[in-house]
């Protein structure tokens, strides 16, 4: 995969994302550039300045029109500071800004990462504490963030509102150019020593002991959590081995505690200046306005130091082997705890054509079940899944191509490199099938047509990555020039094979192996304790006694607490803000029409799609038996893996690439907008293609669903392979979105609807998959029973029953043709009803449920769920306002700023009827749960100001009015039955919410509500069992879990 770079940043409260995809690996990661409606005047050459023109202190250096992307790029330089500036003019209302700085990390203390956090904690023009988070509810931005990469840091935002753009631009520029970088912000965001709960200091009356002191800090805890992700750990240790010149920019907890505030300030002075910056703006807003505002800030600076150093990886002049220890994966057999990969260099990213070609080569070798590397390394059983570094990494100047697998035994580990080299040699001799190459080129054609809402953000991210490593951004944007150059070389014959010969057919490579070690986590704990004792010993010597050292730490903690509490009542009038009055009361209407084809309901959304048709079908199953529900995700995997009697999966993958932009199947679960507890579940099928290829797309989908051969001799082995793919790395998947898993597990205790969803997409599904794998590997009879159940699902998966519904998005001119195609498709479907079972009674007798998942993480993830009301209820909108108010005015300051968690927040799921509290990478879950518990009284008793109410409403409309990709239009009505009128009414209710309304719903649902369920994920401590938690485990061990997987009661 063309892996970008690792993003570590100040995110909003982590969003509740969809379950991690059960995909083999990302498909060819070629940046998906989308077309706009027409080549509008905003991106025409005539409306923009010419080379040599001077505007607001900038001089135009270069100008280029890119017709295939419907944009014009202008490169400028600031006359006084020589700051680089790139403007991308395009008819796109979602405008984007980004400023980046070269920040080569001098060590592994995480100074670029901690600087990224503290930079946004206050500036000269906006001297309040943390203007970044304070701006979140004062803006209609659909994206605000900051990212630390391996060698640069960037600060992007996106918004459709011009005043909002100017407001955010002012805040971002002042933050990056004039940061305050106060020591208390460094202590809060970076690291410090202090008592776990600062508020308990006063009550302990001098009884604070050295053992009560621990390392704290937002970034420190973030990186402890990051290091608990074995995939990240493998990737970063690999980077440290092949790229020692680039230190760990995120920070290693073992070294973060060596960083001082003085070093942070010096690093900022050295790197955060206009001469060392690169700036990008994108969209349809006037360039002159941007230059005037940006130039007004940059003109205060003189030309400064520029870090032009481009770090390079180690030289590979022969084989190098590196082996490091890592954590045990409890979802993998004890005798398969090795992860190993081999890496080569592939040229220079400044050669855009060769780098693009290397990406195609990587995809041909790795993408899909039919790829040669998948067959040799995973299908063979040698390993379970690809390593995190597998693919082409173009984040540095030298592209690095890696291939590796996890879940390998110690005896087989040396064979991995041998197999990789064997496959490379055989592929070189055999050459590449032209049909496969044409398939990838067809995918590029569709990517150019596909209209996405976040095109600008994608351009900025990719441009910064290569620009900071010496690539020409104008060449990067010239998409057709690159593709045409590739085609020209490819058509001469032997080009890709020559590329392989040049870079991969040699032994100039690094083999990196991580070995699962039982003592790994304990050794980390011991090292942290030793570091703490050393720091404490230094403090004791400094202050003369242990007691004085403890007293001084407590005093410093109370001082920080005082600063944090004062900030909660600070005057924010210096910050710019939009007004609620600026928001239209009318929701933009994107009408759909409905029809019936052969008795099947069809929802049509006719819109400009650049000649593409997007297809989505759902088949709903009523009262599906619990044992079959658990198998729906595996069924979806299987039909995209096993092949049919007429074609292997490799042949199907080639056809999919040649005829479509992709097809997929997945399980779906939606709740009623009008009735609590009512839900619909089943399977959904989707894909998109050129209008002329819609018949082929539907034929492919239908064949895969109905004809997949579960009886072939290879089917049992492939089923086990799929189970291993899912279980391998399951703990890392949970660590990445632990708050979401915790919330889903908590909600499962509230209703059968949430329980059913947990069975297919939560921790229960992960454990069920591990159980299936264990049974499949130990009992041929159990495996045969499993396959029979999958065949049963296949018989009714897609059928002409009352549960089948279809949505199409296409051009109006394509509707008639598509209707004829649909008619033929529906007519040819079988008519098989799904089996049913009597739903078990859901136990509502327990008002509060507590589940604790004992997992090997160094921080915690929590979720607390409360049932509320349907979407159409009058309290739904008020609950959403309440969630915003609690997040920004209570949970963020209490749990993140004071408690040190990376993220915390409240959310209202208006369609699900669920109010939720979550924390993410949290060192102090006991305190967090107390804060959750006190939230109701806090919200009920607070006299909410008009400003706070209005900011909460703005926060809701950030998501409500965010741009939507064309393929998503109409899906809300199609899946959930939410009409435009329902959305309009809910919108008006949000705008009309009062402070009194908020107080009342807080009383009703948070204070008086008796039904709630909570879940914690993390390392079990003694208090878990003493406080009434039901302790559970996730494991391959048959006795390692007591998760109820098939019992709704």
From Swiss-Prot:
UniProt cross-references to InterPro entries, sorted A to Z: Metalloenz_LuxS/M16 (IPR011249), Pept_M16_N (IPR011765), Peptidase_M16_C (IPR007863), Peptidase_M16C_assoc (IPR013578), PreP_C (IPR055130)
Keyword Transit peptide: yes
Any one GO BP annotation for this protein: proteolysis involved in protein catabolic process
Gene Ontology molecular function, alphabetical: ATP-dependent peptidase activity; metalloendopeptidase activity; zinc ion binding
Cysteines paired by S-S bonds: none
Cofactor(s) listed in the protein's UniProt record: Zn(2+)
Active site: 116, 189
Record keywords: Hydrolase, Metal-binding, Metalloprotease, Mitochondrion, Protease, Transit peptide, Zinc
Keyword flag Transit peptide: yes
Transit peptide segment: 1-39
Binding site for Zn(2+): 113, 117, 222
Catalytic activity, EC: 3.4.24.-
GO cellular component labels: mitochondrial intermembrane space; mitochondrial matrix
Subunit note: Monomer and homodimer; homodimerization is induced by binding of the substrate.
The family this protein is said to belong to: Belongs to the peptidase M16 family. PreP subfamily.
Protein function: Degrades mitochondrial transit peptides after their cleavage in the intermembrane space or in the matrix, and presequence peptides; clearance of these peptides is required to keep the presequence processing machinery running. Preferentially cleaves the N-terminal side of paired basic amino acid residues. Also degrades other unstructured peptides. May function as an ATP-dependent peptidase as opposed to a metalloendopeptidase.
Name of the protein this chain belongs to: Presequence protease, mitochondrial
Originating organism: Emericella nidulans (strain FGSC A4 / ATCC 38163 / CBS 112.46 / NRRL 194 / M139)
């Amino acid at each position: 995969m063309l892996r970008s770079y690792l993003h570590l940043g100040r995110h909003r409260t982590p969003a509740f994302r969809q379950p991690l995809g059960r995909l083999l690996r990302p498909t060819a990661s070629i940046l998906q550039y989308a077309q706009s409606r027409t080549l509008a005047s905003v991106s025409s050459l005539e409306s923009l300045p010419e080379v040599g023109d001077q505007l607001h202190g900038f001089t135009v250096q270069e100008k280029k029109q890119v017709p295939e992307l419907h944009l014009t790029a202008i490169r400028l330089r600031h006359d006084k500071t020589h700051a680089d500036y790139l403007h991308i003019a395009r008819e796109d209302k979602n405008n984007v800004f980004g400023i980046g700085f070269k920040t080569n990390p001098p060590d592994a203390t995480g100074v670029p990462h901690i600087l990224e956090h503290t930079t946004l904690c206050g500036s000269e023009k906006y001297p309040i504490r943390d203007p970044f988070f304070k701006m979140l509810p004062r803006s209609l931005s659909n994206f605000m963030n900051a990212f630390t990469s391996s060698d640069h840091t960037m600060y992007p935002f996106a918004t459709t509102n011009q005043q909002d753009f100017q407001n955010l631009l002012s805040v971002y520029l002042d933050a990056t150019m004039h940061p305050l970088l106060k020591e208390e912000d460094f202590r809060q965001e970076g690291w410090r020593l202090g008592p776990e709960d600062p508020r308990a200091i006063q009550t302990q009356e001098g009884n604070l002991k050295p053992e009560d002191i621990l390392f704290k800090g937002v970034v420190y805890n973030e990186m402890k959590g990051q290091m608990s992700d074995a995939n990240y750990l493998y990737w970063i240790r690999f980077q440290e081995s092949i790229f020692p010149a680039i230190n760990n920019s995120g920070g290693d907890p073992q070294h973060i505690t060596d960083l001082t505030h003085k070093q942070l300030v010096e690093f900022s002075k050295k790197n955060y200046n206009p001469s060392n910056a690169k700036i990008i703006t994108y969209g349809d807003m006037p360039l002159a306005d941007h230059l005037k505002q940006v130039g007004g800030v940059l003109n205060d600076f003189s030309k400064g130091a520029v870090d032009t150093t481009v770090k390079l990886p180690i030289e590979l002049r022969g084989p190098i082997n590196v082996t490091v220890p890592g954590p045990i994966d409890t979802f993998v057999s004890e005798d398969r705890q090795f992860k190993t990969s081999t890496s080569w260099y592939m040229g220079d990213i400044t050669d855009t054509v060769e780098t693009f070609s290397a990406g195609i080569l990587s995809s041909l070798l790795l993408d899909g079940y039919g790829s040669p590397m998948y067959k040799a390394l995973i299908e063979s059983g040698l390993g379970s899944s690809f390593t995190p570094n597998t693919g082409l990494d173009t984040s540095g100047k030298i592209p690095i191509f890696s291939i590796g697998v996890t879940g390998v035994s110690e005896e087989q580990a040396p064979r991995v490199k041998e197999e990789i080299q064997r496959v490379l040699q055989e592929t070189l001799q055999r050459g590449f099938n032209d049909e496969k190459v044409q398939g990838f080129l067809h995918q590029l054609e569709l990517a150019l047509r596909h209209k996405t809402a976040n095109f600008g953000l994608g351009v900025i991210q990719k441009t910064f990555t290569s620009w900071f490593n010496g690539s020409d951004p104008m060449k990067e944007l010239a998409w057709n020039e690159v593709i045409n150059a590739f085609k020209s070389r490819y058509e001469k014959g032997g080009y890709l094979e020559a590329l392989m010969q040049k870079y991969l057919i040699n032994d100039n490579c690094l083999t990196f192996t991580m070995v699962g070690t039982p003592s790994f986590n304990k050794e980390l704990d011991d090292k942290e304790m030793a570091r703490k004792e050393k720091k404490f010993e230094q403090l004791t010597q400094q202050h003369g006694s242990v007691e004085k050292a403890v007293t001084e730490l407590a005093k410093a903690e109370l001082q920080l607490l005082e600063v944090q509490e004062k900030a909660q009542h600070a005057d924010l009038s210096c910050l710019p803000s939009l007004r609620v009055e600026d928001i239209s009361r009318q929701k933009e209407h994107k009408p759909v029409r409905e029809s019936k084809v052969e008795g099947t309901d069809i929802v049509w959304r006719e819109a400009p799609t650049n000649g593409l048709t997007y297809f989505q079908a759902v088949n709903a199953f009523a009262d599906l038996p619990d044992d079959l529900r658990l198998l729906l995700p595996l069924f979806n995997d299987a039909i995209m893996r096993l092949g049919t009697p007429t074609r292997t999966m490799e042949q199907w993958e080639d056809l999919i690439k040649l005829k479509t932009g992709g097809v997929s199947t997945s399980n779906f679960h939606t709740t009623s907008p009008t009735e609590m507890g009512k839900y619909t579940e089943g399977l959904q099928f989707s894909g998109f293609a050129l209008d002329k290829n819609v018949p082929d797309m539907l034929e492919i989908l239908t064949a895969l669903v109905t004809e997949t051969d579960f009886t072939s001799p290879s089917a049992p082995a492939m089923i086990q392979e799929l189970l291993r793919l899912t279980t391998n790395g399951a703990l890392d998947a949970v660590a990445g979105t632990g708050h979401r898993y915790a919330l889903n597990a908590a909600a499962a205790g509230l209703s059968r609807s949430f329980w059913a969803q947990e069975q297919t997409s939560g921790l229960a599904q992960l454990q069920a998959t591990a159980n299936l794998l264990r049974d499949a590997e130990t009992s041929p009879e159990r495996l045969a029973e499993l396959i029979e159940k999958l065949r049963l699902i296949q018989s009714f998966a897609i059928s002409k029953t009352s549960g089948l519904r279809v949505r199409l998005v296409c051009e109006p001119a394509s509707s008639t043709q598509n209707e004829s195609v649909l008619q033929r498709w529906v007519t040819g479907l079988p008519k098989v009803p799904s089996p049913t079972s009597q739903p078990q009674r859901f136990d509502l007798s327990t008002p509060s449920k507590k589940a604790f998942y004992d997992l090997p993480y160094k921080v915690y993830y929590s979720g607390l769920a409360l049932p509320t009301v349907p979407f159409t209820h009058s309290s739904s909108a008020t609950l959403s306002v309440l969630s915003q108010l609690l997040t920004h005015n209570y949970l963020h300051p209490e749990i993140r700023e004071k408690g040190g968690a990376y993220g915390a927040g409240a959310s209202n799921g208006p369609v699900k009827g669920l109010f939720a509290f979550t924390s993410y990478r949290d060192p102090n879950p006991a305190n967090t749960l107390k804060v959750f518990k006190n939230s109701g009284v806090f919200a009920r008793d607070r006299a909410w100001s008009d400003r706070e109410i209005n900011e909460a409403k703005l926060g809701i409309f950030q998501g409500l009015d965010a741009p939507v990709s064309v393929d998503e239009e109409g899906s809300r009505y199609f899946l959930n039955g939410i009409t435009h009128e329902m959305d309009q009414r809910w919108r008006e209710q949000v705008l009309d919410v009062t402070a009194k309304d908020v107080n009342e719903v807080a009383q009703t649902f948070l204070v008086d509500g008796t039904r709630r369920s909570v879940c914690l994920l993390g390392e079990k401590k003694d208090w878990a069992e003493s406080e009434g938690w039901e302790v559970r485990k996730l494991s391959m061990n048959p006795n390692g879990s007591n998760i109820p997987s098939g019992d709704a009661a």
